[in-house]
Structure formats: structure tokens, C-alpha cells
Amino acid sequence: MPIRVQDELPAVSFLRNENVFVMTTTRATTQEIRPLKVLILNLMPKKIETENQFLRLLSNSPLQVDIQLLRIDARESRNTPAEHLNNFYCNFDEICDQNFDGLIVTGAPLGLVEFNDVAYWPQIKQVLEWAKDHVTSTLFVCWAVQAALNILYGIPKQTRAEKISGVYEHHILHPHALLTRGFDDSFLAPHSRYADFPAGLIRDYTDLEILAETEEGDAYLFASKDKRIAFVTGHPEYDANTLASEYFRDVEAGLNPEVPYNYFPQNDPQNKPRATWRSHGNLLFANWLNYYVYQITPYDLRHMNPTLE
């Protein structure tokens, strides 16, 4: 789907340079099909970089996707210009009376922070409760998965002793599941997290269906049977250099990080990394948009009655 964004959003020129199909609002108004309304709650510090990553994945389908960016942290950002936030982001009270076809909640660098110490924890809880009645399908990514499991299922925060960072192999558990349709039996995806997601914990304390696991037995992709919520514990949206940027940042901070697993050629940080997960990331988001959003969302969003199988 070509994504539909405001004409002036920096991602327009950035993604067009990569030959990604981006449709400005001006052009979209001449088409007579209803775009999917997708809300992105961007919790990452470098918001422009994160916008580019997610919009790239949302752009590769035959229908329009109307993107709305949401922020819930009113504190001054050290990584994103205030002008950008004011021009392209809305606050929750501006959209709380609307319905959306899809919601994406991004990760956040909060792996070692207790939930109640997160500055915007009450706002996250508010958005997730609101989404139950106002969003057809919600996709949680990395830290947002941990937050959602706590809010929706009461699962306590699970933290690893050491951060997991690198590109890991996964395998699908249900070859005919819609969200994994077209996946290879084994595929690669990046991880960068302290959060722990043992598959047994998900099976024992939720009614969610695990669709893909890491080779070590961590849940990677899981969802509710009614398709209303889906979870991905890694970062399929990452650019080729994102893990490298995080690694060198931590080196400069004196944190002595481990070299990201299976990422730099010959395990040498001086070598340029290659993205080995792009096809997986694109297919995952295309499947979510098609099977979890487009196929069940009502045509008239004023009446939130998803067509569930």
C-alpha cells in the first residue's frame, strides 16, 4: 500500500530516494477508495529515524494507508526538533474520539526501568484501554510488547541478566497462520532488548497463540485468535546500521557491550553490516495490514465492528 502522509513530512523525500511509494495527501484526495487509518504511537527517542523505518514497511501494499503520528510524552525531546513534533504529531486528546483501522506501538529504550517509573506509564495504559474500543488491530513492538503483556494480562516485567543484541534465527510454528503466510520456515530478525519473553510464560498465562519462536525458545511473534492484538518482540523495522549505531553508542559510553550476534561480517565491528531481515520485515507488516487490519475492519469507521472469523 502506498502510505499517505502530510506533504511536508521529511520521510517523503527520504523514502522516495529509496524508490519507496509514498503518496502525499494532495495526490490521495483524487482517489476514491478509503485509505486505512493507521495510528503510530512513537515511543523511540529518535522519532524521525523511527518514522522512516516503520513507514518503509507500511508502504509496500496496493491500498492507501493514512498515517497519523501520536505522542504521549510532553517532555522536551533531546533527539527530535520541537518543530517536527508540533507539525506532525498529535496528542491523545486530539484523536481519542476517533476510530482507527490499525495502531502500532513502537519499542522504547526502557528495558531496565520499572513500569511505574516510566514517565508516561499512565498514558500508555490509557491508550491501550482506549484501543480496545477504537482500533481494529494493534501491533506491539519490542518494549511495547512487555508493557502490553503487563497491562492487558497482568504479567510482571521479565528482565534478562544481559542485553540481547544481534540478528537471530527464528522458526514458524504454524505454517498456515495468516500472520506468517509466505514466511520461510526459518528466518532472521534483529533483537535489541533486556526484556525476556519465554514462550512457556506466554502459553501459561495468556490465551495468545505463538506463531514464531527463536531457536532458544523465546516467543518472537504471537497474537490473539481474533486478530485484534499482535506482538513482535524483535525489531524487524531496523535499518542495516541501527544495531551498529547502538553498539558504538554504548562503546563510547564506556558500557563495554558485547558485539551484536551474527551481525557484523566476521564478527568484526569494523566491517559494514548487511541487512538480512528486510524481506521478513516487509512480509510481516504486509500480512498484518492485509489479514489483521484490511480484511476485518469496517468500511464505516464510525461503527467499530470488526468482521471476525
Curated annotation (Swiss-Prot):
Pathway: Amino-acid biosynthesis; L-methionine biosynthesis via de novo pathway; O-succinyl-L-homoserine from L-homoserine: step 1/1. Its EC number is 2.3.1.46. The keyword Acyltransferase applies. Its main location: cytoplasm. GO terms for biological process: L-methionine biosynthetic process from homoserine via O-succinyl-L-homoserine and cystathionine. It is an enzyme of class 2 (transferase). It catalyses: L-homoserine + succinyl-CoA = O-succinyl-L-homoserine + CoA. One of its GO terms (cellular component) is cytoplasm. GO terms for molecular function: homoserine O-acetyltransferase activity; homoserine O-succinyltransferase activity. The record marks S192 as: Important for substrate specificity. Pfam families: HTS. Coiled coil: none annotated. The record marks G111 as: Important for acyl-CoA specificity. Transfers a succinyl group from succinyl-CoA to L-homoserine, forming succinyl-L-homoserine. Belongs to the MetA family. This is Homoserine O-succinyltransferase. It comes from Klebsiella pneumoniae (strain 342).
